[in-house]
Each structure stands twice: as C-alpha cells, then as structure tokens.
C-alpha cells in the first residue's frame, strides 16, 4: 500500500472559492449555487466546474487557482489542468483541475471554515496523518512477500502501486486480463 504524511495544516479551498464568488452560500451556510467547487482527496483536491465547456469559466478558475498558489505557496505546490494531470500523473476523472498541496497541507471541503488552520490552532480537529499525496512525497512502504511461489532473495528497488494487484491475483491463480499493471518479477 502507500504511506501517510503528518498533517501540519488544513486548507479550506472551498472557503476561498466562496470569497472569490465561485460558490454562493445560502443562509444555512451551504451552497445554493456554484461555478466551481473543491472536493478533497487528502493532500490534493479536485476542482469541479459546473460547466466544463465554458472556456471563460475554465480560464477564470485556472487564474484564480494560480493566484491562490502565489498567495499560499506554503500550502499549494502545484495546480494541474485535467490534461496535465492525465499526461503527467495518469490521473483522470470528472475534475477540471487538481491542486497538489505542499508537504503536510490537508485539504478539507468546508465552505465556511477559516481558509487556513494550523495543527497548533484550537480550531484544529483533524487526525494526525493521512494519505492522498503525490508519490514523490513521504515514505515509501515496502512490499514484502515470501512463500512457495515467491523467488527467494529478489529485491526490487522501486515499483508501481498498480502492479500490486496483478501480483496478488497471480499468486491466487486468478486471471484478470483487463487489469492495469503487471505482476512484480518475484514469482517462480
């Protein structure tokens, strides 16, 4: 599996989008209308647009996200377009942008919380660590295997997480031809 990183601070990107006019809240503090919203994936967050075909909206939101990155460099490492996320990271989905947090910055979905809450703040109410970060960050947990179907003494310096499931399926004798990835070169 993948590791976890300690949370240093929580960033509420939806609160920024409210302040920028991309989300309008009702009297109950919940969205009544939106043009863009953030949906947290932990240390990264996906930005969804009401109308992905509206080029003007796409441009406005992209500029706003880059402005937030410039204003909060301690919180935001990278803003990916959907095309960049697919090309560079193999990440696809219904989102228009992906925002990658700086090391230790957790994204949450609140619309009304303070934009930034440090771990030392009395307002901090999150767990201590989580995942959802870029693969270049954090510890790299080992994959350890042994048994009658495993070649002894094999060490792989690095591997793709997508290759874990095909490895386990091969060990179980399950044929899954449509699966992404390939078994680790550890099988007899």
What function would you assign to each model-found segment?
Residues 2-119, 123-125:
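Secreted, luminal/periplasmic, and some membrane-associated catalytic domains
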Residues 22-55, 126-171:
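Substrate-binding rim/cap in mid-to-C-terminal beta-strand-loop elements of soluble/periplasmic
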Residues 79, 150, 184:
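Short clusters of hydrophobic/aromatic residues that line enzyme substrate/ligand-binding pockets
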Residues 112-114, 157-158, 180-182:
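Composition- and surface-driven signal marking solvent-exposed, interaction-prone regions
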